[in-house]
């Protein structure tokens, strides 16, 4: 008996063009989506095929008439600004009718799920908090102004589409009440007897997500709700461990809570969605960071938002998907850096020469981008 005969006949097959051998086949469930290879991530349809699967809508639903409220972490501000510049109706813009609301002025600083929940509880449920919790980025204390509460309520009730971005699970809270601050505690008011740093747990964040969903559905039952997770890492941790490992834990807690919440709730709520901005940035692009290793390269951000626009928004996007993809790949080392500048300046022959020794997939990608950009010119 030859070695391996007891395991059954040797099966030979290919996966993504690579030869494979096995003595057994395995039942992999009703849904089986393989992790992409690096080659899989070269093509312009990489994000559509390997990241958005299971999360994309059947058809674009955001039109210029859709009322949008977007807040949470700093990544929510990118979404708000992008959509507003393209004449979509973002209600909580600083220069808009509800520009005095905290979700307009400081929405990018509400990065933990407690801070997001507080805005819904305060504005829609009239909840009062025992402590003053809200400091802006300049450490100025913001009070529970009734006029601002009513403006926030009006904006939230007018919204057709909520985009809520979570950023971190590390929080500062009041020891006596357990209530959580927007941000860290300003140095001049910090009191170790009153203020406590901690990492909010998976169960806490899951509970907060459920409460946010419950309140929205109570007051605005037909609105669409989208959650996202910001890829922007912690600037620092207050834990006695490295910031890199603390950030990994912080994002994992939030992503796990989101996944459990969405898995349980989406089957019963067709208007509940997730946009995988975190996965696009972290898994698709390699050299994604600016030199400070916190800010995402603008070309990558623009690609994430261009993809969002192609998937979610009606009308013709400002930038073609192949164009945005090539631009981001040039900025992150996936293509020669000069390729996009050649395309942008109309030096199409130079762009083709720059990738002449690259793979067929990359040459085809540059050709697609060239055709898109030529169509915009004429």
Residue ranges and their predicted role:
Residues 1-378:
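Extracellular glycan-modifying ectodomains
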């Amino acid at each position: 008996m030859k070695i391996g005969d007891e395991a059954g006949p040797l099966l030979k097959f290919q996966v993504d063009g690579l030869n494979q051998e096995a003595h057994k086949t395995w039942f992999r469930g009703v849904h089986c989506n393989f992790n992409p290879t690096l080659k899989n991530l070269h093509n312009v349809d990489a994000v559509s095929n390997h990241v958005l699967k299971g999360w994309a809508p059947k058809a674009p639903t955001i039109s210029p008439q859709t009322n949008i409220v977007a807040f949470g972490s700093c990544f929510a501000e990118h979404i708000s600004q992008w959509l507003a510049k393209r004449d979509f109706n973002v209600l909580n813009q600083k220069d808009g009718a509800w520009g005095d609301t905290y979700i307009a002025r400081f929405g990018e600083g509400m990065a933990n799920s407690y801070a997001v929940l507080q805005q819904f509880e305060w504005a829609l449920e009239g909840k009062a908090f025992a402590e003053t919790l809200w400091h802006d980025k300049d450490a100025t204390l913001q009070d529970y102004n009734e006029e601002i509460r009513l403006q926030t309520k009006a904006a939230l009730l007018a919204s057709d589409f909520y985009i809520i971005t979570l950023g971190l699970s590390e929080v500062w809270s009041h020891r006596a009440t357990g209530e959580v601050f927007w941000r860290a505690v300003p140095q001049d008011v910090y009191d170790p007897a009153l203020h406590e740093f901690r990492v909010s747990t998976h169960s806490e964040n899951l509970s907060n997500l459920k409460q946010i969903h419950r309140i929205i559905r109570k007051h605005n039952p037909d609105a669409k709700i989208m959650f996202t997770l910001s890829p922007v890492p912690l600037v620092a941790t207050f834990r006695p461990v490295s910031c890199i490992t603390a950030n990994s834990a912080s994002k994992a807690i939030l992503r796990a809570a989101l996944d459990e919440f969405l898995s349980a709730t989406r089957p019963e709520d067709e208007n509940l969605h997730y946009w995988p901005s975190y996965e696009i940035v972290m898994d698709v692009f390699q050299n994604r960071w600016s030199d400070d290793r916190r800010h995402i390269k603008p070309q990558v951000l623009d690609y994430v938002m261009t993809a969002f626009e192609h998937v979610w928004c009606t009308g013709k996007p400002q930038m073609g998907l192949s164009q945005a993809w090539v631009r981001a790949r040039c900025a992150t080392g996936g293509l020669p850096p000069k390729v996009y500048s050649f395309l942008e300046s109309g030096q199409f022959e130079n762009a083709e020469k720059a990738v002449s020794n690259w793979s067929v997939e990359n040459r085809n990608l540059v050709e697609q981008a060239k055709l898109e950009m030529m169509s915009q010119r004429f």
